[in-house]
């Protein structure tokens, strides 16, 4: 979480040049440590251009977190991979135009930010017209046996896959990152009043 907060001045700069795109704000609630139990959390992707990489992260090597966008326009999920050969770490942030808690979604516009932590690189689609989540499932995570619900927050498993038709770019526009595909399952924490069932009944 501290790493993501330290990147916020750069991320916020995207607001001014992003053509109306959503910039991922820090996620509150679930700490940036671990993901889902076992191998239920994962991220797979294929990058070309500025980065030649095919992340395939599972289980304990993956950290994830998520929540609702502050403006109520959808949800976001963040993934942090394991350290590379030189200590750099790759973070992906997905901003998805779907209501929190919606069980199933298809063809959802999505904004993606890719950050190389320790490498001073950031690429963003700067808008939701370049990438699309083809399918997405949101399912509430059960409480541990015998545990009582102590707050109005609920944890969800978010599983999605999709692709991009146009590349992400560096802040100065000099580099392009092509995201051929992505497939992930992570977590998000929502307040009761942020969930689809609550907002749709108003």
Q: Residues of each region from the PLM?
A:
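C-terminal motif of bacterial Sec signal peptides marking the signal peptidase cleavage site
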Residues: 13-16
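A periodicity- and composition-biased signal for non-globular, repetitive helical segments
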Residues: 8-9, 50
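An ectodomain-focused feature that recognizes extracytoplasmic/extracellular
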Residues: 21-133
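Acidic, glycine-rich flexible loop segments
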Residues: 106-188
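Intrinsically disordered, low-complexity acidic/polar segments
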Residues: 54, 167-171, 193-195
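Bacterial N-terminal signal peptides that target proteins for export
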Residues: 1-8
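Short, low-complexity, Pro/Ser/Thr/Gly-rich segments in the mature regions of secreted, periplasmic
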Residues: 185-202
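Surface-exposed beta-strand edges and their flanking turn/coil or helix-capping segments
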Residues: 92, 172-175, 197-199
């Amino acid at each position: 979480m501290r790493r993501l907060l330290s990147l916020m001045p750069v991320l916020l700069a995207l607001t001014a040049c992003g053509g109306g795109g959503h910039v991922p704000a820090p996620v509150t609630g679930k700490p940036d440590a671990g993901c889902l139990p076992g191998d239920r959390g994962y991220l797979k992707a294929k990058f070309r251009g500025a980065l030649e990489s095919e992340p395939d992260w599972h289980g304990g090597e993956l950290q994830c977190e998520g929540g609702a966008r502050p403006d109520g326009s959808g949800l976001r999920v963040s993934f942090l991979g394991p350290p590379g050969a030189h200590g750099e770490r790759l973070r992906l942030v997905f901003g998805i135009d779907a209501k929190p808690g919606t069980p199933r979604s298809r063809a959802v516009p999505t904004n993606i930010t890719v950050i190389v932590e320790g490498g001073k690189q950031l690429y963003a689609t700067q808008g939701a017209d370049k990438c699309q989540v083809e399918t997405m499932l949101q399912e509430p995570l059960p409480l541990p046996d015998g545990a009582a619900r102590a707050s109005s927050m609920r944890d969800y498993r978010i599983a999605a896959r999709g692709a991009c038709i146009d590349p992400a770019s560096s802040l100065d526009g000099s580099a392009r990152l092509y995201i051929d595909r992505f497939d992930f399952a992570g977590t998000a924490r929502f307040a009761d009043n942020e969930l689809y069932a609550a907002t749709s009944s108003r």
